[in-house]
């Protein structure tokens, strides 16, 4: 083959390679600009396409600066609840602000969802299992889809949710200022009876019987048997109440979270909560939170009938055998919760 022909063939091959390289580069440039103009879509846990959160309205904006000019009845209701907390804190400032500065340990009940800019203070015996399930769905990045598929014991594993005390002080302050903060409350004595029934009348709660039952029986029961002192599994409600109002109890250690006051768990006189949900309107209030977070179209609060739920009628029965003196002392322990969340004094109480 002649040298001139070989040279022509070699040049053609080089030209084709250069053309292919240029074409590939051009395609990459086009793809880059398209990605800049159209952000990559991600899928929420239920398979609904939603764009990245950046640029959308935050829950705080949805709550305090709604698109519609006229506030809804729900928004007005929650404003009244916020005002009730503020007024109670102001009226009881000497009691409610004994501690001016919170420590990180005070924030361990505040669960953080960075994706949706939410902070939830969980209160045991106020639907906290289902709300922890919801927070796991919201923060799970696709790991979970149906809240009710998450086992109850898994919802209470601390490693599954991030709490505010795990952040630095500047990060804590930023989130308290920028995120929507909410909690759920319940009539204080109904919550207390619910805690007693769950922790002291169920045979499987051996750890509570050993940890608290034995101590309560030793302190409150005269002529207790050795078996009762050893097992602690037959604590009477009257003994439980006597333990709670005993001044020595909280001097020894703080109340367990299941019967600790909401005021002490969530510090509403130090932290401004944007929403106060109530157990009595649980489904409605929960779905309002989800709506403000921008997930209400595909995520709802789980509903199911629980036949073992503690009711007002049950609570009335439990308090029948409590003396008026002990009822009065117990009310003083939970008084701030009654006032702050606008619960009236129960009609069954015989206060001195």
From Swiss-Prot:
GO terms for biological process: apoptotic process; carbohydrate biosynthetic process; chondrocyte development; chondroitin sulfate proteoglycan biosynthetic process; developmental growth; embryonic digit morphogenesis; embryonic viscerocranium morphogenesis; in utero embryonic development. Residues 1-16 are cytoplasmic. It comes from the Eukaryota. 3'-phosphoadenylyl sulfate binds at residues 124-130, 186-194. InterPro entries: Carb_sulfotrans_8-10 (IPR018011), Sulfotransferase (IPR005331). It catalyses: chondroitin beta-D-glucuronate + n 3'-phosphoadenylyl sulfate = chondroitin 4'-sulfate + n adenosine 3',5'-bisphosphate + n H(+). One of its GO terms (cellular component) is Golgi membrane. Residues 38-352 are lumenal. GO terms for molecular function: chondroitin 4-sulfotransferase activity; dermatan 4-sulfotransferase activity; N-acetylgalactosamine 4-sulfate 6-O-sulfotransferase activity; sulfotransferase activity. Widely expressed. Highly expressed in spleen, thymus, bone marrow, peripheral blood leukocytes, lymph node, heart, brain, lung and placenta. It is found in: Golgi apparatus membrane. Signal peptide: none annotated. The chain crosses the membrane at residues 17-37. It holds the Pfam family Sulfotransfer_2. Glycans are attached at residues 205, 223, 321, 342. Its EC number is 2.8.2.5. Changing residue 125 to Q: Abolishes enzyme activity but does not affect stability of the protein. N-glycosylated; required for activity and stability. Catalyzes the transfer of sulfate to position 4 of the N-acetylgalactosamine (GalNAc) residue of chondroitin. Chondroitin sulfate constitutes the predominant proteoglycan present in cartilage and is distributed on the surfaces of many cells and extracellular matrices. Can also sulfate Gal residues in desulfated dermatan sulfate. Preferentially sulfates in GlcA->GalNAc unit than in IdoA->GalNAc unit. Does not form 4, 6-di-O-sulfated GalNAc when chondroitin sulfate C is used as an acceptor. It is linked to A chromosomal aberration involving CHST11 is found in B-cell chronic lymphocytic leukemias. Translocation t(12;14)(q23;q32) with IgH. This is Carbohydrate sulfotransferase 11.
């Amino acid at each position: 083959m002649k040298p001139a022909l070989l040279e022509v063939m070699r040049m053609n091959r080089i030209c084709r390679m250069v053309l292919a390289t240029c074409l590939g580069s051009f395609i990459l440039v086009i793809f880059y600009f398209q990605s800049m103009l159209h952000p990559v879509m991600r899928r929420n846990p239920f398979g609904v396409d939603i764009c990245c959160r950046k640029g959308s309205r935050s829950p705080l904006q949805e709550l305090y600066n709604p698109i519609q000019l006229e506030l809804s009845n729900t928004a007005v209701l929650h404003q009244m609840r916020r005002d009730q907390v503020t007024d109670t804190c102001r009226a009881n400032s000497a009691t409610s602000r004994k501690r001016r500065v919170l420590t990180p340990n005070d924030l361990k009940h505040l669960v953080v969802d960075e994706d949706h800019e939410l902070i939830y203070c969980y209160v045991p015996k106020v639907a906290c299992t289902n709300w922890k399930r919801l927070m796991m769905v919201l923060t799970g990045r696709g790991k979970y889809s149906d809240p009710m598929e998450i086992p109850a014991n898994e919802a209470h594993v601390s490693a599954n949710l991030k709490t505010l005390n795990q952040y630095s002080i500047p990060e804590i302050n930023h989130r308290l200022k920028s995120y929507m903060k909410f909690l759920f409350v319940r009539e204080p004595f109904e919550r207390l009876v619910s805690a007693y029934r769950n922790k002291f009348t169920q045979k499987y709660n051996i750890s509570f019987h050993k940890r608290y039952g034995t101590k309560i029986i030793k302190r409150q029961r005269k002529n207790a048997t050795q078996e009762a002192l050893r097992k602690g599994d037959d604590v009477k409600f009257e003994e439980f109440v006597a333990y709670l109002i005993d001044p020595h109890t909280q001097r020894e250690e703080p109340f367990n979270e299941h019967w600790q006051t909401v005021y002490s768990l969530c510090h509403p006189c130090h932290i401004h909560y944007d929403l106060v949900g109530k157990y009595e309107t649980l489904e409605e209030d929960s779905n309002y939170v989800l709506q403000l977070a921008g997930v209400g179209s595909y995520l709802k609060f789980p509903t199911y009938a629980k036949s073992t739920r503690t009711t007002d009628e049950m609570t009335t029965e439990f308090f029948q055998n409590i003396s008026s003196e002990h009822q009065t002392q117990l009310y003083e322990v939970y008084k701030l919760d009654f006032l702050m969340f606008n619960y009236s004094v129960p009609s069954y109480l015989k206060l001195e």
